From Swiss-Prot:
One matching Pfam family: DHBP_synthase
Residues binding Mg(2+) 2, per UniProt: E39, H154
Organism expressing this protein natively: Vibrio cholerae serotype O1 (strain ATCC 39315 / El Tor Inaba N16961)
Subunit annotation: Homodimer.
Protein family according to the UniProt entry: Belongs to the DHBP synthase family.
Gene Ontology BP, a term: riboflavin biosynthetic process
UniProt name for this protein: 3,4-dihydroxy-2-butanone 4-phosphate synthase
Pathway listed: Cofactor biosynthesis; riboflavin biosynthesis; 2-hydroxy-3-oxobutyl phosphate from D-ribulose 5-phosphate: step 1/1
Primary gene name: ribB
Enzyme class (EC, first level): lyase
List of residues binding Mg(2+) 1: E39
């Protein structure tokens, strides 16, 4: 069965997006799947402005461990975050910047609480480059302008979701894994979503939603 048929129990694409937006407004997480012919993976996504230590602990425990902070290009520029490498030749052109740590309010930087502190520091609209140390235990990602209509990635999906929900345009993501360390696929992602009260949606759902409602996002 493909993504569409497996996700049918969650409603049509528009309903799935609206359920995800409501969950984010309520401070809950969502699960975002990319295309089956791309990574074909699902990421847990939380809004930065409501992110809790307990939510971060769940991400660290249930996911790959590489917790990423999705930022607009403007915020990444404000923080003077350069690309992780000069020549990005990764398969999906994931726009990693140098990793970061908050300069104040953290110990080693690796605990759930410390990572939340770093993330909230970096996402603050008034943040300055000197508020952050480099490298660190949080991995910022630059969302491409135009969002999922420009690049069908989890990074763009995350920032688009925050803007569509009327939230600060910053979110965290991490790839969901199975207990044996393998990557979770659609059936496992659906079961995880049911267990943790997280709506499941796809990048394709978001593309359809934005086109149908002619949503122009930053």
């Amino acid at each position: 069965m493909n993504q569409s048929s497996l996700l049918a129990e969650f409603g049509d694409p528009i309903t799935r997006v609206e359920n995800a937006l409501q969950a984010l407004r309520e401070g809950r997480g969502v699960l975002l799947l990319d295309d089956e012919d791309r990574e074909n993976e699902g990421d847990i996504i939380y809004a930065v402005e409501s992110l809790t230590t307990a939510q971060m602990a769940l991400m660290i425990r249930e996911c790959s461990g590489i917790v990423c902070l999705c930022l607009t290009e403007a915020q990444a520029d404000r923080l003077a975050l350069p690309p992780m490498v000069v020549n990005n030749n990764s398969a999906n052109q994931t726009a990693f910047t140098v990793s970061i740590e908050a300069k104040h309010g953290v110990t080693t930087g690796v605990s759930a609480q410390d990572r939340v502190t770093t993330i909230k520091t970096a996402a603050n609209p008034q943040a300055k480059p000197e508020d952050l140390a480099r490298p660190g235990h949080v991995f910022p990602l630059r969302a491409r302008a135009g969002g999922v209509l420009a690049r069908r990635g989890h990074t763009e999906g995350t920032v688009d979701l925050m803007q569509m929900a009327g939230l600060q345009p910053a979110g965290v993501l991490c790839e969901l894994t199975n207990p044996d360390g393998s990557m979770a696929k659609t059936p496992e992602i659906i079961e995880f979503g049911k267990l943790h009260n997280m709506p499941v949606l796809t990048i394709e759902d978001m593309v359809q939603y934005r086109i149908q409602f002619d949503l122009k996002l930053a």
